[in-house]
């Protein structure tokens, strides 16, 4: 765009500069906004840029001054760098397959060091403590610092990634493996950022509801620029902006590289991220250039240096740091004679030392200081660094991420660059270096952390205990529904409605729904509990005149997440780990379409287990034939199998309201009173039927996973044992009647709320017996239940056959027939679907007769008679294939 009147242009610029000098940024911002509004009303389309020039956001004149001892901190930071590198290399000398990462921490050491020295607040009596999501691949640096602090021994460093024998260090942040050290698992790319957002949001929730004091704690999330391509990394940033989460700080290590090559070789990742975050209403703080560039910026009166910085793409910037100062002079400054003139007095070595912002402690401190003091917005810090910084041959190379070994020449260069006191003769031994106790370095480390409340990272393992109301509180569920038909989903809603009335536990219950509350019949809670909103309710809801109107409230208890399963699960994790992060045990209930649970957010569910989260996941509208009208994408037949892959997840598929009540009460007791590091997955259905009263003595069997529901004590020549769960148990009950009435065969009916728990018990017993060959073998719970029973065993569920197949090895009878809903779902009536998937009462009878025929107890023709009697088509297509 050509400047047609330079004099007028300068007058406008001088006027703006005068306003900035005399009246400040706010006034200048106001005037520019008004001018933009005027132009817009006049129909003028003004140029609009959501990004700023490729330079630091904070000008030199506005930088907060770092108060500490720069030279001492560089000394300590260098030792941390060395020990991190030595730890990874020594582990790979022991076993080359152990792996490890050097380059990520090498690029981010300064980013962490400034945080540890000045910003990461540890929990104290006066301060709840900051929550820090460390970038997973940078864990060696965190261990190395903890070693200097005396928290981790040299033996532990030696055992990096060697955990089986004990006293080792986990590869990445894993609370399950190091429960007093790591707070959050982060190395599955993208899960750290989305969890950090919802931890910050849940912190505001706890503040609004009076559980924790307001405004003290921060959530820090460290991540890489390549990680930002994960949908979870950026998918929830609009929520953070909308909720004005000024307790949240993202620090993105922009070393411009991912595993295979550049993040945006043909563009600029920092500029791209600036636009994305600024558009989501974040405070964006770019830290691109270090302080050695400041004199050159001061000379850049015509803007040519800035223009050159703006036009160079990331692939070229990576090249500059993979080469040397002469290359930078030729290819960066050599683009214009004026730029070459600007650096004519600088040697190639001095040009090489022109540093990037993420390696400059002064620039990083200024950015962090601005972030913690910024109000009304979350902050993202985009810090430009060099991958593999200081590692010599691996620095800024495409192979940097996979570097686990450094040659002797590079080690020597690393030692010299960072002034490590290791002799040439000892270099290949890679000795750890730790200053003596009482040294200046040790004192400085201790003083910096003491000023911030103690060492980090640290994780609280136990919290205050909260009593859980007795089972009798849920008496209405235990006594049955009389003649009224209700679903287990409705029973669940009634259980929660009762529990929230308890003075101790009630306020700590956190109902979480992804825009499906009305589907599950929970809209009555809108008015009762309120929906959490950081601003309350600024409008009059359209249904205000109704009893169950949509009520938003700053102190609302329900988290209504919208159509957002990953966000809802992240909220659940935040609530489920609140006992550790805030010493406030909360009990979250996240209810969702069971098909859109583990199948959709399985990685987050795995992270929940690693995080030792407590709470209930409720798979609503479960069962492949029970949610009959929704079809293939909605009908769940495998969520229990997916849940079974998480070791500390307890899963149940109850049929009746009393089973559900017993399970929820016992789970609450285990997680809230005993603080066991487990969580529960329970499926509930939308099929209405009469809910019976609980049989006497059923509680123990419900929790263990199996109990005798109906015993056929009548005389019969032949007998079978029928197992079922969920709504299909009712088909099993009907099958028992058909066997008796149509064939004179007796049948005991067993309710099996959890085949997964039966498998867990069986495996534990099997292992014990293997390890104690000289002692009397123990029996699994399945064997205890079925050991003295007559006849073959038949199981039918609304899930894949593999679900009930899990217990086959402990079933005493050789004849164990399993029915299940393998195959794609489809829409139709429940009756037709259950026949299609071969799990209804007639198919249960058929399987029972087949098992008896296999034993020789009855003739095969009886099976054929049943096929004809019930109109079963022998040539029917296999549901697995159609």
Regions found by a protein language model. Give the residues of each.
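Non-catalytic terminal/interface segments that mediate subunit docking, oligomerization
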Residues: 58, 62-84, 105, 120-123, ...
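Thiamine diphosphate
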Residues: 6, 162-185, 191, 205-216, ...
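N-terminal amphipathic, basic-rich helices that act as targeting or association modules
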Residues: 1-149, 414, 486-502, 506, ...
């Amino acid at each position: 765009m050509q400047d047609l009147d330079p004099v007028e242009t300068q007058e406008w610029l001088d006027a703006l500069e005068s306003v900035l000098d005399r009246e400040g940024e706010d006034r200048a911002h106001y005037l520019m906004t008004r001018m933009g509004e005027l132009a817009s009303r006049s129909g003028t389309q003004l140029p609009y840029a959501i990004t700023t020039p490729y330079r630091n956001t904070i000008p030199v004149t506005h930088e907060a001054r770092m108060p500490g001892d720069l030279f001492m901190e560089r000394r300590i930071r260098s030792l941390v760098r060395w020990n991190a590198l030595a730890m990874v290399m020594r582990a790979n000398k022991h076993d080359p397959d152990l792996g490890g990462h050097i380059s990520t921490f090498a690029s981010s050491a300064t980013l962490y060091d400034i945080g540890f020295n000045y910003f990461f607040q540890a929990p104290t009596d006066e301060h709840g403590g900051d929550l820090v999501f460390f970038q997973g691949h940078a864990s060696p640096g965190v261990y190395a610092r903890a070693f200097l602090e005396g928290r981790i021994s040299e033996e532990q460093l030696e055992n990096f990634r060697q955990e089986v024998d004990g006293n080792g260090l986990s590869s990445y942040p894993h609370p399950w493996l190091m429960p007093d050290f790591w707070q959050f698992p982060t190395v599955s790319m993208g899960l750290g950022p989305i969890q950090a957002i919802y931890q910050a949001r849940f912190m505001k929730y706890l503040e609004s509801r009076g559980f924790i004091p307001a405004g003290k704690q921060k959530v820090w999330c460290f991540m890489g620029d390549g990680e930002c391509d994960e949908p979870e990394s950026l998918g929830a940033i609009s929520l953070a902006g909308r909720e004005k989460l000024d307790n949240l700080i993202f620090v993105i290590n922009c070393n411009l590289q991912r595993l295979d090559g550049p993040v945006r070789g043909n563009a600029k990742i920092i500029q791209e991220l600036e636009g994305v975050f600024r558009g989501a209403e974040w405070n964006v703080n770019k830290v691109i250039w270090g302080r050695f560039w400041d004199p050159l910026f001061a000379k850049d009166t015509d803007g040519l240096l800035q223009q050159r910085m703006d036009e160079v793409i990331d692939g070229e910037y990576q090249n500059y740091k993979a080469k040397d100062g002469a290359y930078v002079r030729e290819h960066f400054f050599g683009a214009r004679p004026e730029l070459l003139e600007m650096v004519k007095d600088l040697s190639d070595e001095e040009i090489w030392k022109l540093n990037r912002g993420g390696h400059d402690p002064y620039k990083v401190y200024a950015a962090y200081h601005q972030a913690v003091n910024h109000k009304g917005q979350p902050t993202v810090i985009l810090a430009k660094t060099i991958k593999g910084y200081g590692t010599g041959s691996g620095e800024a190379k495409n192979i940097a991420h996979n570097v686990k070994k450094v040659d002797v020449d590079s080690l020597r260069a690393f030692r010299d660059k960072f002034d490590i006191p290791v002799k040439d003769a000892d270099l290949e031994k890679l000795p750890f270096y730790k200053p003596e106790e009482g040294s200046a370095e040790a004192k400085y480390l201790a003083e910096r952390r003491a000023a911030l409340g103690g060492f980090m990272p640290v994780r609280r393992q136990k919290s205050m205990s909260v009593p859980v109301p007795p089972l009798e509180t849920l008496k209405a569920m235990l006594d049955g529904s009389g003649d009224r038909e209700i679903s287990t989903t409705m029973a669940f809603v009634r259980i929660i409605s009762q529990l929230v009335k308890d003075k101790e536990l009630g306020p700590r219950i956190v109902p979480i729904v992804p825009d499906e509350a009305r589907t599950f019949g929970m809209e009555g809670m809108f008015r009762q509990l309120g929906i959490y909103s950081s601003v309350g309710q600024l409008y009059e809801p359209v249904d205000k005149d109704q009893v169950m109107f949509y009520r938003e409230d700053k102190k609302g208890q329900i988290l209504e997440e919208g159509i957002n399963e990953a966000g809802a699960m992240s909220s659940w994790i935040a609530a489920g780990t609140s006992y550790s992060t805030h010493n406030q045990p909360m009990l979250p209930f996240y209810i969702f379409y069971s098909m859109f649970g583990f199948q959709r957010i399985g990685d987050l569910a795995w992270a929940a287990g690693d995080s030792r989260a407590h709470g209930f996941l409720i798979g609503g509208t479960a069962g492949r034939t029970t949610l009959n009208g929704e079809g293939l994408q909605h009908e769940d037949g495998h969520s229990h199998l997916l849940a079974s892959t998480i070791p500390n997840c307890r899963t149940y598929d109850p049929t009746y309201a009393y089973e559900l009540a017993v399970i929820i009460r016992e789970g609450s007791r285990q997680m809230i009173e005993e603080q066991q590091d487990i969580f529960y997955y329970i499926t509930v259905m939308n099929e209405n039927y009469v809910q019976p009263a609980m049989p006497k003595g059923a509680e123990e069997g419900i929790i263990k996973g199996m109990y005798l529901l109906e015993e056929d004590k009548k005389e019969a020549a032949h007998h079978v044992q029928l197992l079922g769960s969920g709504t299909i148990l009712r088909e099993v009950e009907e099958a028992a009647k058909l066997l008796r009435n149509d064939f004179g065969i007796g049948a005991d009916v067993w309710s099996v709320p959890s085949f997964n728990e039966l498998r867990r018990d069986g495996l534990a017993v099997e292992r014990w017996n293997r390890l104690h060959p000289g002692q009397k073998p123990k029996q699994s719970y399945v064997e205890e239940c079925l050991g003295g029973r007559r006849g073959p065993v038949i199981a039918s569920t609304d899930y894949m056959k593999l679900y009930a197949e899990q217990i086959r090895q402990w079933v005493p009878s050789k004849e164990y027939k399993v029915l299940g809903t393998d195959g794609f779902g489809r829409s139709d009536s429940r009756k037709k679907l259950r026949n299609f998937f071969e799990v209804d009462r007639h198919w249960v009878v058929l399987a029972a007769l087949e098992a008896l025929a296999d034993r020789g107890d009855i003739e095969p023709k009886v099976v054929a008679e049943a096929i004809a009697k019930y109109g079963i088509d022998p040539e029917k297509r296999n549901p697995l294939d159609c």
